[in-house]
Amino acid sequence: MYLGIHVSSSGGIQNSITNGEKYGVNSIQIMPTAPMRWATKLITDEQIDIFLDTLERSSIKKILIHGIYLTNLAREDKQLFHLGKMGLVVYLDFAERVAKGIKERKIDSEILGVCFHPGSQKELSYEDSLERISYGMQWVLDEVKGNQKLLIETTAGTGGNLGRN
């Protein structure tokens, strides 16, 4: 059985692993960067090596990466739409590289993918918002080749939030 928790990665992404272990769980959900800042720079190989070193010595088996909270792929604003896509590219790239490191090092752990809130309907119609989200997701998947999943987190659907069904 797997039991997990969303943990902080403050002070370095490797801290998410030790924070999860403090709670006695074997699965964690993490945000590799600050949740309320645009993630536009790829996570370095050195950061990933430190993360893998920590993971190798841990009891964490499952890791889900959560996208930043600023992502709204339903936005019509081209700059905000692009920043949202790039944040997902950064996280999906991180997931791919960590999964590769897990395989190479034969670590008994797994990256489950990147989940994110799809966004809120603001400027566009409901149908156009869904089309925009679909286009944004496909763009991200085309940018980052690999096997990691891009997962939409369901929402309550309040305030124009999309992803409720």
Which role fits each region the language model picked out?
Residues 1-67, 71, 77-90:
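N-terminal pre-domain/capping segments
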Residues 57, 73-165:
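Active-site acidic/histidine proton-transfer and metal-coordination neighborhood
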